[in-house]
Every structure is written in structure tokens, then in C-alpha cells.
């Protein structure tokens, strides 16, 4: 796994400074101890978990590619018939390389990797990157999925806009698809928003610079750019997609640059 830390600014977080595993992770990701921080990182049952300190009843956030909802979706989620697979262009004999420019907790990236794509996740927030790294560590060690996870899922830490732009100017980078799922403000009242998502949003905030992602994504992707949006959201950067794949609450806006061929 390749991790590149392009973020020079430090981020304050509360953690047990006498726990070497957490201290090492925080040092690696530029996280500094802050006794008054809103969030805490803990390491329990071999899992790095984020807790919102002023809402202790809320479930902590961690990245788990081995069990739970993502494992169930991998086994029973519909395979290549899923909307995300159609949006990315997965079909018989075609396993596109994908850069997920807004990795978040890595769930969509994992779906694509489980279906055969080689996926590079880009995540700019150091706390989220630390959670992703820990999730990948456990997945890489898993007897069932470890082999293909090590081959297909990688993590890159840095600004999404800068990373996409830099990769687009590199002659060594070949990417079929860029996938984007920028954080969008929820229309519902906060009580209706999933508790985990509420904690996550309070950590990372809305992607106010999301419109700036489309141009470098289009420059990098050789085949298409896929943007996941809530059904009520406007087009990213005001640019109309080539086609739209709608789901119950979201849609995939697809910007086609070239045909997806084997």
C-alpha cells in the first residue's frame, strides 16, 4: 500500500498518548494531541475507531471491509448489475482502473474493487485517511479477501483537486475512470440523517470546493468520470452529464470521454 502525505497542516485530536499503536498512527498522519478536541481516536478489538466526545452514545466510526454491511453487499448486493457498476462501465471482460477522488470511508471503492476494478482511493482528511489505512490493514490480513484486496485497493493521502491535476499531467498515470462522491449538505433535518453520517459530516464538513473536482477529473480519466449525487443536487460545476443512472435516493452522473472497451 502506498501512502503519500501531501497535507502539511496538523490536525488536533484527543487520544491515549500511552497507547503506542494510536500514537504511531497519529504521528504518521500528522495528528497532534489536543485535550480539548471534539473527536477522539481509540483502538479497541484491533480496530481504530473515531468517537465524537460530546455525543458518547453515538456509535464510533471505523472502516471495516471484512464484515458487516459491506461484506453482505459483496456477497449479496447484485454484482455487476448494481447501478454503480453500470455507471463505471463494468461489463464482461472489462475491469477499468478507477481513481476514487473522494474516498470517504471507502465503501464505494470497495464495491468496485470486489467486482474486479483496481481502485486508488484519494482522501484528503488525515483522520479519515488513518481510518482507511486501518481498514485496509485488516482487509489485507483477511484469509478470504486479503489476496485481491492487496492487489486492487490502494490509498493516497492528499488534496483531491491537486492529486487529480498532478496525475493528469503525469505520463506514467493511466486511469480509465475517475469516481467522485463529494460530501453534499443533507436536505433533511439533522435528526433524520443517519447518526454515523452526522458524525462524519461534522468531522469533514461539506466539500465546498467540489465543483473544482470535475475539470481535473475529466483531464485524468481516459474513458469516463462518474459523479454520485443526491437526487435533488445540481449538476457538478453546472456541467450536464452524458447520461444519468438513477437510484432510489441518489443518481450517478456519467461524463463519457471514450467508449469502454476490453
UniProtKB/Swiss-Prot annotation:
The keyword Transcription does not apply. S-adenosyl-L-methionine binds at residues 107-108, 123-124, 159-160, 181. Keywords: Cytoplasm, Methyltransferase, rRNA processing, S-adenosyl-L-methionine, Transferase. One of its GO terms (cellular component) is cytoplasm. It catalyses: guanosine(1516) in 16S rRNA + S-adenosyl-L-methionine = N(2)-methylguanosine(1516) in 16S rRNA + S-adenosyl-L-homocysteine + H(+). Transmembrane segments: none annotated. Gene3D superfamilies: Vaccinia Virus protein VP39 (3.40.50.150), YhiQ-like domain (3.40.1630.10). Its main location: cytoplasm. GO terms for molecular function: rRNA (guanine-N2-)-methyltransferase activity. Its EC number is 2.1.1.242. CDD domains: AdoMet_MTases. Disulfide bonds: none annotated. The keyword Transcription does not apply. It is found in: Cytoplasm. Belongs to the methyltransferase superfamily. RsmJ family. PANTHER family: RIBOSOMAL RNA SMALL SUBUNIT METHYLTRANSFERASE J. Specifically methylates the guanosine in position 1516 of 16S rRNA. This is Ribosomal RNA small subunit methyltransferase J. It comes from Shewanella woodyi (strain ATCC 51908 / MS32). The gene is rsmJ.
Amino acid at each position: 500500500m502506498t501512502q503519500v502525505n501531501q497535507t502539511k497542516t496538523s490536525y488536533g485530536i484527543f487520544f491515549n498518548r500511552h497507547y503506542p499503536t494510536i500514537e504511531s498512527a497519529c504521528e504518521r498522519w500528522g495528528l497532534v494531541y489536543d485535550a480539548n478536541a471534539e473527536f477522539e481516536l481509540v483502538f479497541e478489538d484491533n480496530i481504530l475507531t473515531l468517537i465524537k466526545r460530546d455525543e458518547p452514545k453515538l456509535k464510533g466510526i471505523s472502516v471495516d471491509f471484512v464484515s458487516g454491511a459491506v461484506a453482505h453487499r459483496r456477497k449479496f448486493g447484485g454484482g455487476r448489475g448494481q447501478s454503480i457498476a453500470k455507471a463505471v462501465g463494468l461489463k464482461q471482460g472489462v475491469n477499468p482502473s478507477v481513481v476514487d477522488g473522494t474516498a470517504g470511508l471507502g465503501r464505494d471503492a470497495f464495491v468496485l474493487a470486489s467486482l474486479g476494478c483496481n481502485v486508488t482511493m484519494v482522501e484528503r482528511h488525515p483522520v479519515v485517511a488513518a481510518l482507511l489505512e486501518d481498514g485496509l490493514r485488516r482487509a489485507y490480513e483477511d484469509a478470504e479477501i486479503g489476496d485481491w484486496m492487496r492487489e486492487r485497493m490502494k490509498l493516497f493521502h492528499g488534496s483531491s483537486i491537486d492529486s487529480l491535476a498532478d496525475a493528469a499531467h503525469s505520463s506514467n498515470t493511466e486511469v480509465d475512470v475517475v469516481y467522485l462522491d463529494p460530501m453534499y449538505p443533507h436536505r433533511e433535518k439533522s435528526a433524520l440523517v443517519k447518526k454515523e453520517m452526522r458524525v462524519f459530516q461534522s468531522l469533514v464538513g461539506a466539500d465546498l470546493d467540489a465543483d473544482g473536482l470535475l475539470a481535473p477529473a475529466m483531464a485524468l480519466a481516459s474513458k469516463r468520470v462518474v459523479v454520485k449525487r443526491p437526487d435533488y443536487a445540481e449538476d457538478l460545476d453546472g456541467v450536464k452529464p452524458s447520461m444519468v443512472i438513477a437510484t432510489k435516493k441518489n443518481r450517478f452522473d456519467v461524463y463519457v470521454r471514450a467508449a469502454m472497451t476490453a
